[in-house]
Swiss-Prot record:
The lineage of its organism: Eukaryota, Fungi, Dikarya, Ascomycota, Pezizomycotina. Belongs to the chaperonin (HSP60) family. It is found in: Mitochondrion. One of its GO terms (cellular component) is mitochondrion. Signal peptide: none annotated. This is Heat shock protein 60, mitochondrial. One of its GO terms (molecular function) is ATP-dependent protein folding chaperone. Keywords: ATP-binding, Chaperone, Mitochondrion, Nucleotide-binding, Stress response, Transit peptide. It comes from Paracoccidioides lutzii (strain ATCC MYA-826 / Pb01). GO terms for biological process: protein refolding. InterPro entries: Chaperonin_Cpn60_CS (IPR018370), Cpn60/GroEL (IPR001844), Cpn60/GroEL/TCP-1 (IPR002423), GroEL-like_apical_dom_sf (IPR027409), GROEL-like_equatorial_sf (IPR027413), TCP-1-like_intermed_sf (IPR027410).
């Protein structure tokens, strides 16, 4: 028995030692694969590189441009989770595309970046930017292949873009009426007048700088909810302050407001405010960095006994931003903010230092102040101060975002558009259109409007480039590239409507070149005054699309080398079997 055990053990040891060689081969093969995977790159040069990039750009642009115009088609996109997505939003389509060939995918990704950047700045115009970038790059590639200097072509392109932007800014029209706002929103929502009216109503109620958000609704119909006043994301400190147990919220009419930048813990700090609340028979709301200890206990005790109506809320924001928001609330409610800088003590508060508002609603998560009794002039002055800081070049993007939020809360209110629909797919598609329409409307309010349907760019091609004086022939070709490229959006819109684009574009640039507003209504198939017909584009959208597209496309034209990661090479199928064969041989040797 002992002998058998020893023999068996020797056999296993023998087989283990004999398998070391094939294991080392596996390890060396793994190292080789890693070297292949991380060290190997593929390069393409010159015409071949630009041709691959152009092929990728053409593929992506073909998918995106089908959505352009009133008769543009939808795109169905597979989703890794849940239902497929149906959309007519250019940037959504662009982001969904990944190509198998890595060089082609490089071009597609650059075009995706153009669409994303345009969407980020203007909120719309991504399809127009894609059309322009494709047209500019394809013409640049042809001219570079013919022997033109790519740097001079780029200089000509950039000078032409600057001239077009200047021409558009000269001929823009400021948006003034609710009807014009509705027209802009309707066009961007693919001709949906209901969406246009919804957005114009929201903007009318909360102001042009008011906060408008878009959310998924829970019913079939679209809904608009408007909060007129200031809302911030801080709720009650203790549930003992609740006045409406069913809705779990605090509601006061005509409350007094006490504002403090510091924590309140000592009871003597709030006694003057509590006495004012009692004598005036009005509720008291304390907004401070925090309220704790004896001060909080006294407030809760008085509330539970029914001796006075009181509630406490933590101040919104952090650091300097909290200080600024408290100042905004002070202006809105005509309250004094107790701060260290003013050397004001809470125990010396007088009734005239307390603010006042029409009503206040406090939930667990947020507080809404309605109809603050602050001076209209003081509020307007505060808004102007915030605008001046926003326009300061030294202000960071993060600070601008916070300042915009403060300005919106002071100047208007908050509107929520709840998008309804019968299914998740329908709600998602409609929500994309509503967001596009909202972004386009904001852009129109900010910089003005132009005749839509690509008309403004067509007229710029006919009239906006005549004053340029290129220094050489290649720069002249660069200007010509832009002149041809900016006719492409109008041509694409017409072709998506099933008509002959070159004929209609030719008529607009030849017969109607002198009439800036005269364009072609692709939905009805008529030549009309585009502004009069309500077919408009925001200047900011058109300008951003052209600048972004020309910048990337002309830079691509100067590309001489493209480098990508080489595809991973698979391990040959026979290598694993060979290793096993060696192992089996070793086992056989051990047995004998």
């Amino acid at each position: 028995m002992q002998r058998a055990f020893t023999s068996s053990r020797a056999s296993v040891l023998s087989s283990a030692s004999s398998t070391r060689a094939p294991l080392s081969r596996f390890r060396s093969a793994g190292v080789g694969l890693q070297q292949q995977r991380f060290a190997h790159k593929e390069l393409k040069f010159g015409v071949e590189a630009r041709a691959s990039l152009l092929k990728g750009i053409d593929t992506l642009a073909k998918a995106v441009t089908t959505t352009l115009g009133p008769k543009g088609r939808n795109v169905l996109i597979e989703s890794p989770y849940g239902s497929p997505k149906i959309t007519k939003d250019g940037v959504t389509v662009a982001k969904a595309v990944t190509l198998q060939d890595k060089f082609e995918n490089l071009g597609a990704r650059l075009l995706q970046d153009v669409a994303s950047k345009t969407n980020e700045v203007a909120g719309d115009g991504t399809t127009t930017a894609t059309v322009l970038a494709r047209a500019i790059f394809s013409e640049t590639v042809k001219n570079v292949a013919a022997g033109c200097n790519p740097m001079d072509l780029r200089r000509g392109i950039q000078s032409a873009v600057e001239a077009v932007v200047e021409y558009l800014q000269t001929n823009k029209r400021d948006i003034t009426t609710t009807e014009e706002i509705a027209q802009v929103a309707t066009i961007s929502a693919n001709g949906d007048t209901h969406v246009g009216k919804l957005i114009s109503n929201a903007m009318e109620k909360v102001g042009k700088e008011g906060v408008i958000t878009v959310k998924d609704g829970k019913t079939i119909d679209d809904e608009l909810e408007v909060t007129e006043g200031m809302r911030f994301d801080r709720g009650y400190v203790s549930p003992y302050f609740i006045t409406d147990t069913k809705a779990q919220k605090v509601e006061f009419e005509k409350p007094l407001i006490l504002l403090s930048e510091k924590k309140i813990s000592a009871v003597q700090d709030i006694i003057p405010a509590l006495e004012a609340s009692t004598s005036l028979r009005r509720p008291l709301v304390i907004i401070a960095e925090d309220i704790e200890g004896e001060a909080l206990a006294v407030c809760i005790l008085n509330k539970l006994r029914g001796q006075l109506q009181v509630a406490a809320v933590k101040a919104p924001g952090f650091g300097d931003n909290r200080k600024s928001i408290l100042g905004d609330i002070g202006i809105l409610t005509n309250a004094t903010v107790f701060t260290d800088e003013l050397d004001l003590k809470l125990e010396k508060a007088t009734p005239d230092m307390l603010g006042s508002t029409g009503s206040i609603t406090i939930t667990k998560e947020d507080t809404i102040i309605l109809n603050g009794e602050g001076s209209k002039d003081a509020i307007a002055q505060r808004c102007e101060q915030i605008r001046s800081v926003i326009s300061d070049p030294a202000t960071s993007d993060y600070e601008k975002e916070k300042l915009q939020e403060r300005l919106a809360k002071l100047s208007g209110g908050v509107a929520v558009i709840k998008v309804g629909g019968a299914s998740e797919i329908e709600v998602g598609e409609k929500k994309d259109r509503v967001v596009d329409a909202l972004n386009a409307t904001r852009a129109a309010v900010e910089e003005g409007i132009l005749p839509g349907g690509g008309t403004a760019l067509l007229k710029a091609a006919a009239n906006g480039l005549t004053s340029l004086n290129p220094t050489n022939f290649d720069q002249k070709l660069g200007i010509s590239i832009i002149k041809n490229a900016i006719t492409r959006p109008a041509r694409t819109i017409v072709e998506n409507s099933g008509l002959e684009g070159s004929v209609i574009v030719g008529k607009l640039t030849d017969d109607f070149a002198g009439d800036f507003n005269r364009g072609f209504d692709s939905a009805r198939g008529e030549y009309v005054d585009m502004i009069g017909a309500g077919i408009v584009d925001p200047l900011k959208v058109v300008r951003t699309a052209l600048v972004d597209a020309s910048g990337v496309a002309s830079l691509l034209g100067t590309t001489e080398v493209a480098i990508v990661e080489a595809p991973e090479e698979k391990v040959p199928a026979g290598s694993g079997a060979g290793g096993m064969g060696g192992g089996m041989g070793g086992m056989g040797g051990g047995m004998f």
